[in-house]
């Protein structure tokens, strides 16, 4: 069988077209992921700058002002400094656990952003079990902290890792029960469905008013999960030097701070999504898709998505003032007080709140 030149050229052009389509497919898949990572990076820089400015205002002092206008580049300068510092390893520590621990803490928190709807149809993974996937993923982070503490071969680090694990277990259960109550109210565990369930009555339809007890418990539990004051026992300076971070330096030390602010941002985003209506305009009977005519007008679709993202971020950063202010307001708890608050106070109340929510949903059928 003889194949002429035209056939060979057709085969070559087809194979070239197929390879180009594969490349375009990979690029199209990576674009939303890279966009999300870039947005998260900018969000963390904004949080660090906000915290420093708010802290300076509370303490009546001047915050960062030399690195960039109003000190906005100070966090970037600190990160660059840590990037070029030497990475030290404990002489008798477990090098593998010591190196893997910070990565697990950061990656597990980063994965949580995949189920957050920043705007209408602007979510990386719209799953039916979105909120519970976040809880499952976030429960992996304490394993990384425990590995870091154990791999350091240092009593302060190991105690800090144990405290982080105990604190996470204690407050994960009330947090899960609050999320389960929200799922019952919305008849779905998808983050997108939960936001849309709050859209009908505007500001009055927020789950904040339907679940005030759950909101308070969720806020306290998320503070404990983020290890923010008054729940920063795993790294209490007066007791454990720096907890599981004691032996770390350089970029690995910086990863723990990145994980802390990632966790703070994702917790605030979930508060905005679960309790504050997400991307919706706070006007009764007007939702973002209807207001900007998503189905017909492409320009309106782009503008509406942008407005939804801005609304979500405004709610998130306004809520961030509360945990930042709490840091400089309340003293640190003792370990026994922390565990008693989680197991003897928040757990029974969150369970009672879940039973009340279930009863109200059954009677409304």
From Swiss-Prot:
Domain of life of the native organism: Eukaryota
This protein's UniProt keywords: Chloroplast, Membrane, NAD, NADP, Plastid, Plastoquinone, Quinone, Thylakoid, Translocase, Transmembrane, Transmembrane helix
Gene name of the record: ndhA
Enzyme class at the top of the EC tree: translocase
UniProt protein name: NAD(P)H-quinone oxidoreductase subunit 1, chloroplastic
Annotated function: NDH shuttles electrons from NAD(P)H:plastoquinone, via FMN and iron-sulfur (Fe-S) centers, to quinones in the photosynthetic chain and possibly in a chloroplast respiratory chain. The immediate electron acceptor for the enzyme in this species is believed to be plastoquinone. Couples the redox reaction to proton translocation, and thus conserves the redox energy in a proton gradient.
Reaction catalysis annotation: a plastoquinone + NADH + (n+1) H(+)(in) = a plastoquinol + NAD(+) + n H(+)(out); a plastoquinone + NADPH + (n+1) H(+)(in) = a plastoquinol + NADP(+) + n H(+)(out)
Annotated InterPro entries: NADH_UbQ_OxRdtase_su1/FPO, NADH_UbQ_OxRdtase_su1_CS
Pfam families: NADHdh
Record note on quaternary structure: NDH is composed of at least 16 different subunits, 5 of which are encoded in the nucleus.
NCBIfam families from the UniProt entry: PRK06076.1-2
PROSITE patterns: COMPLEX1_ND1_1 (PS00667), COMPLEX1_ND1_2 (PS00668)
Known EC number: 7.1.1.-
Protein family (similarity comment): Belongs to the complex I subunit 1 family.
Gene Ontology biological process terms in this record: aerobic respiration; photosynthesis, light reaction
GO cellular component, one term: chloroplast thylakoid membrane
Subcellular location field: Plastid, Chloroplast thylakoid membrane
Membrane topology: Multi-pass membrane protein
Species this protein is from: Populus trichocarpa (Western balsam poplar)
Gene Ontology MF term list: oxidoreductase activity, acting on NAD(P)H, quinone or similar compound as acceptor; quinone binding
Residue intervals passing through the bilayer: 30-50, 104-124, 129-149, 253-273, 302-322, 338-358
């Amino acid at each position: 069988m003889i194949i002429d030149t035209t056939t060979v050229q057709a085969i070559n052009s087809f194979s070239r077209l197929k390879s180009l389509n594969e490349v375009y497919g990979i690029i199209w898949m990576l674009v939303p992921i890279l966009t999300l990572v870039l947005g998260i990076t900018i969000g963390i820089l904004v949080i660090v700058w906000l915290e420093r400015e708010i802290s300076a205002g509370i303490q009546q002092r001047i915050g960062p002002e030399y690195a960039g206008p109003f000190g906005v580049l100070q966090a970037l300068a600190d990160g660059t400094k840590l990037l070029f510092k030497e990475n030290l390893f404990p002489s008798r520590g477990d090098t593998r656990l010591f190196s893997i621990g910070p990565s697990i803490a950061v990656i597990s928190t980063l994965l949580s952003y995949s189920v957050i709807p920043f705007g209408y149809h602007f979510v990386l993974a719209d799953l039916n079990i979105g909120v519970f996937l976040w809880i499952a993923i976030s429960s992996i982070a304490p394993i990384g902290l425990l590995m870091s503490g154990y791999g350091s071969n240092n009593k302060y680090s190991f105690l800090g890792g144990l405290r982080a694990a105990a604190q996470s277990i204690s407050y994960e259960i009330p947090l899960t029960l609050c999320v389960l109550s929200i799922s019952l109210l919305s008849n779905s565990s998808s983050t997108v469905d939960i936001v849309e369930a709050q859209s009908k009555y505007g500001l009055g339809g927020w789950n904040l008013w339907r679940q005030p007890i759950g909101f308070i418990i969720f806020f306290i539990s998320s503070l404990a999960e983020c290890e923010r004051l008054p729940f920063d026992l795993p790294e209490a300076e007066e007791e454990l030097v720096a907890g599981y971070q004691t032996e770390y330096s350089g970029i690995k030390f910086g990863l723990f701070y990145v994980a802390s602010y990632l966790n703070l941002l994702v917790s605030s985003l979930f508060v905005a999504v679960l309790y504050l209506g997400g991307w919706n305009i706070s006007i009764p009977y007007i939702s973002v898709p209807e207001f900007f005519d998503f189905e017909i007008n492409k320009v309106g679709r782009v503008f509406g998505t942008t407005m939804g993202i801005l609304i979500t971020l405004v709610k998130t950063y306004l809520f961030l003032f509360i945990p930042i202010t709490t840091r400089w307001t309340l003293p640190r708890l003792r370990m026994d007080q922390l565990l008693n608050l989680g197991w003897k106070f928040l757990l029974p109340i969150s369970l009672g709140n879940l039973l009340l929510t279930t009863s109200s949903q059954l009677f409304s059928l």
